[in-house]
């Protein structure tokens, strides 16, 4: 998962990474203005609101209920109402170009990101208005920063708003199951539930932190990033983005404004201390207060205590501090073990350790000063510089009254400290530098400060100073400032040389092995990029190629050292073959510890006493060379200089004792840099130090490939992907295969048996065995090889019995089309034929054609009159027309005089005449005769239209074929060539009987105009096309034309029904006669339909009952009406009754299912018998039963005789019920049809075979079955049923 943008808080827009910066900027601006105590009550509450607002943005669920906002928020200036796309543009505009910017709060945090943010007052506006936020904060009000999105209330804090929104339960439908909190969106509820369940799937790869949301992980990852390229020009603080820096700059601007205001108020009011809350009436008192209580923050404080980091302004204050705070402490000399009771004695004693001035020494600072100056930071920039000829140091200022100048008139040097991050270099003490680093450069990473004596790292400069003063006070040596010196001293022996080339040759020969060759060149070569020195040019070239990846860098030639020039301090490694030269002893020592561990010092021809002391395990001391002027015969003069420090000794014993001190220093116990614990060996130190850096984490290892995973889910996924194999199991032989191809080959070889099917070429029947085919040929084709099967109706012969049966079905088609010579055996087929071929959308007009006599006239009222005459004639012969399903009066047909096409509505005929013959409504007979005169000779056999040419007829025939019909009826699925014909067809689906009444409000409709107006009164909101529907049949209309056609159709039916009830036909009602007793009934549902010799007959319930009991053998004449009522018996139970009323009451009480037809007097022709009985049919043998118990007994007999298994003879598949077998045979019938199943009677399409089976059982009866068995009276809907029946029942 494109990813959804997280929503920002509604009222405040704080960009990522700067929420904490903004809060710090606000706090600093408030603190600069004098803190909260000097503010009004409204200011304090507003600041608390902003603090709450900034703190809420860092919570896990600060954006839960907020909706998605736009990708870019708009920043609006409150003075000129100009919009900006970013906070930086708005800040620049407010600072330089806004004409209305005043001294008020810029209100940069008041972003118009919510719809109501422009209408809500900012915190400064509330302050200016003097709002009272303390009254009813939780109840809310108007004009506050956090408005409710559901009502008009607003609140000063976001927490109050969240609590208030929970009362709108109707607007928050999603509820947390753990804490019952409500949410507006489901995604917010799901995000909140993760806080309860602890589902944190986003893990940080730097630490063990985990988060439930990816944006929280991104914010957390910024804490691991140390790059902050954007720095503040005021305080040098770094930021990760420009927006964070600009937001931070607002704090300086506010601070400046608050300071300006405080200065204005200071002229009128008291003076307040910037470091505490004390106020003073005069400036002198404030300065005295700062010097007394805050001396470390004063610019005049430059005297530092030698015991603690406090600084003081004058000497008297410093001495008073030492006597009060450090009176009981003994003051030790850092150079020797002597102790003194006063500081003055220590300073006087330190003069004895200073070396006298000579031509080969520069002026050395005080040893204590040297111990401070010898401390260096790990970074190259944090260094201490010694200024010659400057004022005395702060540590020497207490001795100004005793000895300020040396005997030779030279002043002591002053040590000053520089900041490694800015250009400020005038810090007089370490304490002042530390304060500067902690206040101005607090965002910088913490650096370690390394001691040059023991290489220990300290967190601060003050700790380094205390470390040198306490641990190395007996071995501290001053930093010497060398002047004009021309002698070069060897690091490993007391010899001195006049030039650097001689020194390098001496190191090669004497200290790099007995067989070492002297270098070819006489000069040293230095890299111009890193200033590293090399003895040969090839070594320098190789270094440039490897370290700086370049070949064109130029080298720095070795300077020619003259006796009058200054020296260059260099340190060479005695182990490297290219003899690199380092600029400091610290770099050389680190190089030896990293690259030459456990390597003893190189061979030397000198004695051990003349060599430098070396650490036994790791360290090799390579001290700074002592370059002294003069000859190399200083030892012969009786002076033994120490190459580790600047001391000289007059005899060899004292020199040897001094060297032992350096050796003990190098062989000291090694301390842990984390906890300062001492260890005897490096191994124990390393083992201990590993504990500080070791963290344990649980990993899950794969046993197969040894891969590690942080969670069990990752391991399981790896196992499923890499080490899981899918096996294929053969259920026939239980064999297992590792691939799909293998099991396919196995099934094809082992379990694929050939099975031959034998098909009869004459009738296309398939047989499993050759014997079955032989039996079939014997019975069907052996007797008469020629066409042995002859139709008894027409004499046509056929070669197979199946072909004869299919032909015989054409003779039983009792439904003839009145427009053409085609006949059909089902009503639904005739209706379909009329719709497709003759555009007739009602099939009720074929009543008069059942006997094969088509109508000879197309007049409007003739079919209805003929039907009325047949119904009114009491002496009419017994016929079956009145008992058919289509016995209703047919709709009036409108035929075209030119082409013979017939339509059910006059408007459809007019549309046809206009569309096909160009004859408009209302034209005279001359135009019609002219059109008839020009009628073509080519006639369409489908719709009887005529054309002048064969090409025109061919193009017309394309309209009757499938591909041209692009419009499908949504009700029945039938397709039509045009939208107009589809509209005309959809009207015929109307089943509404009350055609003149609105089905919504039951209001009668009289005309088409009233129908259209009434449809507009009941619009259909679900119809997105027109918004209307037919109020009579409730069909949805897609156009205004379709609505008008509906109106014409329903109003014509209304006119037809009113014409039938006119005085000419008043009192006439359609009656239905029983074919046996000729009794008349008002509804055709009162008659039971029977098929006798292929013709339908209607019998009443009484005649059906008597026929079932064997009482009636044929058609009996009607009983006389004046028969006495005595001797009436019940036809069901043969009980005698005295009157017809008693018999009728008995029939209704005891025989409710069947109402008998008694021989007593009838009340009239309008009495309606009871409905026909419900029957049950067996699927297996198609026998019919009257009640459910009988069919259950019958089915049980089938199960006892035949078993519960029913076999499909076409595929040999077994089923446990006949219904499932029938469904399976339906699937056989539609194999290869694309998964669709069409009803063979009404052509309704289904997607499942069982649905089609249910449809046939519910809609169609025995009379609708198509395929007849030639050997038994059973009928079937599908040919596969007939085949399966023949193969199972008549195979022998």
Curated annotation (Swiss-Prot):
One of its GO terms (biological process) is negative regulation of DNA-templated transcription. The keyword Metal-binding applies. It is found in: Nucleus. Keywords: Activator, Developmental protein, Differentiation, DNA-binding, Metal-binding, Neurogenesis, Nucleus, Phosphoprotein, Repeat, Repressor, Transcription, Transcription regulation, Zinc, Zinc-finger. Gene3D superfamilies: Classic Zinc Finger. The keyword Transcription applies. A zinc finger (C2H2-type) spans 75-101, 146-168, 174-196, 202-224, 230-252, 271-294, 303-326, 331-353, 417-441, 449-472, 488-511, 525-548, 571-596, 640-662, 670-692, 700-723, 728-751, 758-781, 789-811, 815-838, 894-916, 938-960, 967-989, 1028-1050, 1072-1090, 1128-1151, 1176-1198, 1206-1228, 1237-1260, 1267-1290. One of its GO terms (cellular component) is nucleus. The modification Phosphoserine is found at residues 55, 58, 612, 1062. Residues 371-385, 612-623 have a biased composition (Low complexity). Residues 41-54, 1144-1155 have a biased composition (Basic and acidic residues). Residues 110-125 have a biased composition (Polar residues). Disruption phenotype: Mice are runted and ataxic, the cerebellum is underdeveloped, and the vermis is severely reduced, resulting in diminished proliferation by granule cell precursors in the external germinal layer, especially near the midline, and abnormal differentiation and migration of ventricular zone-derived neurons and Bergmann glia. In the remaining cerebellar structures, the Purkinje cells are poorly developed and mislocalized. Residues 1-11 have a biased composition (Basic residues). Within the cerebellum, Zfp423 is expressed in both ventricular and external germinal zones. Transiently expressed in newly differentiating olfactory-receptor neurons. Its main location: nucleus. GO terms for molecular function: sequence-specific DNA binding; zinc ion binding. Residues 1-21, 33-70, 95-125, 354-407, 598-635, 1144-1171 are annotated as: Disordered. Homodimer. Interacts with SMAD1 and SMAD4. Interacts with EBF1. Interacts with PARP1. Interacts with CEP290. Belongs to the krueppel C2H2-type zinc-finger protein family. Transcription factor that can both act as an activator or a repressor depending on the context. Plays a central role in BMP signaling and olfactory neurogenesis. Associates with SMADs in response to BMP2 leading to activate transcription of BMP target genes. Acts as a transcriptional repressor via its interaction with EBF1, a transcription factor involved in terminal olfactory receptor neurons differentiation; this interaction preventing EBF1 to bind DNA and activate olfactory-specific genes. Uses different DNA- and protein-binding zinc fingers to regulate the distinct BMP-Smad and Olf signaling pathways. C2H2-type zinc fingers 14-19 mediate the interaction with SMAD1 and SMAD4, while zinc fingers 28-30 mediate the interaction with EBF1. zinc fingers 2-8 bind the 5'-CCGCCC-3' DNA sequence in concert with EBF1, while zinc fingers 9-13 bind BMP target gene promoters in concert with SMADs. Znf423 gene is a frequent target of retroviral integration in murine B-cell lymphomas. This is Zinc finger protein 423. It comes from Mus musculus (Mouse).
């Amino acid at each position: 998962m494109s990813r959804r943008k997280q929503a920002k808080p509604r009222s405040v827009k704080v960009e990522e990474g700067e929420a904490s910066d903004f809060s710090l900027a606000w706090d600093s601006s408030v603190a600069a203005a004098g803190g909260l105590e000097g503010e009004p009550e409204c200011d304090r509450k507003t600041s608390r609101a902003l603090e709450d607002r900034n703190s809420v943005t860092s919570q896990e669920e600060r954006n839960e209920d907020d909706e998605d906002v736009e990708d870019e928020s708009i920043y609006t200036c409150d003075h000129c109402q100009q919009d900006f796309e970013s906070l930086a543009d708005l800040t620049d505009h407010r600072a330089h170009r806004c004409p209305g910017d005043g001294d008020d709060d810029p209100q940069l945090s008041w972003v118009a990101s919510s719809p109501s943010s422009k209408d809500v007052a900012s915190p400064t506006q509330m302050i200016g208005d003097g709002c009272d936020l303390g009254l009813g904060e939780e109840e809310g009000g108007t004009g506050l920063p956090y408005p409710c999105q559901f009502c008009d209330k607003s609140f000063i804090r976001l927490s109050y708003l969240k609590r208030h929104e929970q009362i709108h339960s109707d607007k928050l439908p999603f509820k947390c199951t753990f804490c019952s909190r409500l949410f507006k969106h489901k995604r917010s509820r799901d995000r909140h539930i993760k806080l309860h369940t602890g589902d944190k799937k986003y893990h940080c790869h730097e630490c063990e932190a985990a988060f439930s949301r990816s944006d929280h992980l991104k914010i957390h990852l910024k804490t691991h990033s140390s790059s902050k390229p954007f720095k503040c020009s005021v305080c040098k603080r770094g930021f990760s983005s420009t927006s964070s820096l600009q937001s931070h700059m607002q704090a300086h601007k506010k601070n400046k404004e608050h300071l300006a205001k405080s200065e204005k108020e200071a002229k009128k009011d008291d003076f307040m201390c910037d470091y505490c809350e004390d106020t003073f009436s005069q400036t002198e008192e404030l300065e005295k207060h700062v010097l007394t209580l805050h001396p470390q923050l004063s610019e005049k404080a430059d005297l530092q205590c030698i015991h603690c980091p406090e600084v003081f302004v004058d000497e008297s204050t410093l001495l008073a501090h030492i006597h009060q705070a450090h009176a009981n402490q003994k003051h030790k000399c850092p150079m020797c073990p002597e102790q003194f009771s006063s500081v003055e004695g220590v300073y006087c004693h330190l003069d004895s350790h200073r070396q006298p001035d000579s031509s080969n020494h520069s002026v050395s600072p005080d040893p204590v000063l040297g111990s401070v100056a010898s401390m260096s930071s790990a970074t190259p920039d944090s260094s201490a510089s010694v200024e010659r000829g400057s004022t005395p140091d702060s540590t020497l200022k207490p001795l100004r009254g005793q000895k300020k100048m040396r005997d030779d008139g030279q002043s002591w040097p002053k040590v000053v400290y520089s900041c490694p991050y800015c250009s400020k270099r005038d810090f007089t003490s370490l304490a002042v530098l530390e304060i500067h680093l902690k206040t101005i450069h607090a965002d910088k990473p913490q650096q370690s400060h390394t001691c040059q004596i023991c290489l220990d790292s300290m967190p601060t400069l003050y700790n380094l100073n205390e470390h040198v003063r306490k641990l190395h006070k007996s071995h501290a040596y001053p930093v010497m400032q060398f002047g004009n010196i021309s002698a070069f001293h060897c690091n490993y022996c007391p010899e001195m040389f006049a030039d650097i080339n001689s020194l390098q040759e001496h190191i090669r020969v004497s200290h790099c092995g007995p067989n070492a060759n002297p270098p070819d060149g006489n000069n040293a070569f230095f890299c111009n990029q890193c200033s590293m020195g090399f003895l040969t040019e090839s070594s320098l070239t190789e270094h440039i190629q490897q370290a700086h990846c370049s070949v064109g860098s130029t080298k720095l030639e070795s300077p020619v050292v003259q006796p009058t020039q200054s020296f260059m301090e260099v340190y060479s490694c005695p182990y490297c073959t290219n003899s690199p030269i380092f600029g400091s002893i610290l770099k050389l020592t680190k190089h030896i510890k990293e690259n030459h561990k456990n390597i003893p010092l190189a061979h030397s021809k000198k004695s051990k006493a003349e060599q430098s002391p070396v650490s036994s395990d790791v360290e090799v001391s390579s001290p700074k060379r002592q370059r002294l002027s003069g000859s190399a015969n200083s030892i012969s003069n009786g002076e033994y200089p120490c190459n580790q420090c600047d001391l000289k000794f007059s005899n060899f014993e004292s020199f040897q004792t001094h060297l032992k001190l350096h050796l003990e220093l190098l062989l000291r116990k090694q301390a842990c840099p984390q906890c300062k614990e001492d260890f005897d060996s490096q191994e124990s130190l390393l083992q201990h130090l590993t504990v500080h850096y070791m963290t344990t984490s649980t990993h899950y290892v794969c046993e197969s490939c040894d891969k590690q995973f942080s969670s069990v889910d990752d391991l399981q996924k790896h196992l499923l992907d890499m080490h899981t194999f899918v096996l294929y199991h053969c259920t026939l032989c239980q064999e297992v295969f590792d691939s799909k191809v293998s099991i396919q080959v196995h099934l094809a070889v082992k379990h694929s048996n050939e099975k031959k099917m034998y098909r009869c070429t004459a009738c296309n029947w398939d047989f499993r065995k050759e014997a079955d085919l032989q039996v079939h040929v014997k019975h069907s084709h052996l007797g008469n090889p020629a066409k042995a099967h002859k139709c008894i109706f027409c004499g046509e012969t056929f070669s197979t019995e199946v072909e004869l049966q299919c032909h015989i079905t054409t003779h039983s088609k009792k439904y003839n089309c009145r427009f053409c010579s085609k006949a059909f055996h089902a009503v639904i087929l005739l209706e379909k034929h009329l719709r497709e071929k003759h555009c007739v959308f009602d099939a009720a007009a074929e009543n008069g054609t059942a006997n094969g006599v088509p109508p000879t006239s197309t007049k409007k009222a003739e079919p209805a009159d003929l039907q009325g005459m047949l119904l009114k004639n009491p002496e009419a012969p017994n016929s079956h027309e009145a008992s058919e399903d289509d016995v209703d009066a047919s709709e009036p047909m409108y035929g075209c005089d030119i082409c013979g096409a017939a339509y059910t509505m006059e408007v459809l005929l007019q549309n046809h005449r206009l569309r096909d013959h160009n004859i408009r409504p209302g034209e005279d007979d001359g135009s019609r005769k002219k059109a008839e005169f020009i009628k073509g000779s080519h006639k369409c056999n489908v719709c009887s239209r005529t054309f002048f040419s064969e090409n025109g007829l061919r193009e017309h025939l394309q309209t009757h074929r499938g591909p041209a019909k692009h419009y499908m009826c949504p009700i029945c699925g039938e397709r039509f060539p045009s939208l107009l014909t589809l509209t005309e067809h959809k009207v015929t689906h109307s089943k509404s009987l009350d055609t003149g009444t609105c089905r919504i409000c039951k209001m009668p409709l009289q005309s088409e105009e009233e129908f259209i107006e009434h449809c507009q009164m009941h619009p259909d909101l679900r119809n997105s096309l027109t918004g209307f529907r037919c109020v009579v049949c409730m069909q949805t209309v897609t156009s205004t034309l379709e609505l008008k056609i509906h109106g014409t159709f329903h109003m014509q039916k209304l006119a037809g029904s009113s014409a039938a009830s006119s005085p000419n036909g008043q009192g006439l009602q359609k009656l239905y006669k029983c074919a046996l007793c000729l009794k008349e009934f008002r509804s055709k549902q009162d008659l039971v339909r029977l098929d006798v010799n292929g013709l339908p007959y209607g019998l009443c319930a009484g005649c059906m009952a008597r026929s079932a009991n064997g009482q009636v053998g044929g058609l009996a004449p009607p009983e006389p009406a004046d028969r006495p009522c005595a001797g009436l018996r019940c036809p069901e139970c043969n009980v005698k009754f005295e009157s017809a009323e008693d018999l009728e009451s008995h029939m209704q009480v005891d025989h409710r299912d069947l109402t008998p037809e008694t021989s007593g007097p009838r009340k009239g022709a309008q009495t309606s018998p009871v409905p026909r009985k419900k029957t049950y049919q067996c699927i297996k043998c198609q026998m019919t039963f009257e009640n459910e118990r009988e069919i259950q007994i019958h089915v049980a007999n089938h199960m006892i005789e035949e078993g519960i298994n029913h076999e499909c003879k076409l595929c040999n598949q077994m089923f446990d019920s006949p219904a499932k077998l029938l469904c399976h045979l339906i699937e056989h019938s539609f194999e290869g049809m694309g998964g669709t199943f069409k009803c063979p009677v009404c052509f309704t399409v289904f997607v499942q075979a069982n649905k089609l089976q249910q449809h046939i059982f519910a809609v169609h009866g025995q009379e609708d079955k198509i395929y007849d068995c030639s050997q038994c009276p059973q009928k079937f809907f599908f040919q596969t049923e007939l085949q399966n029946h023949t193969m199972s029942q008549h195979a022998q």
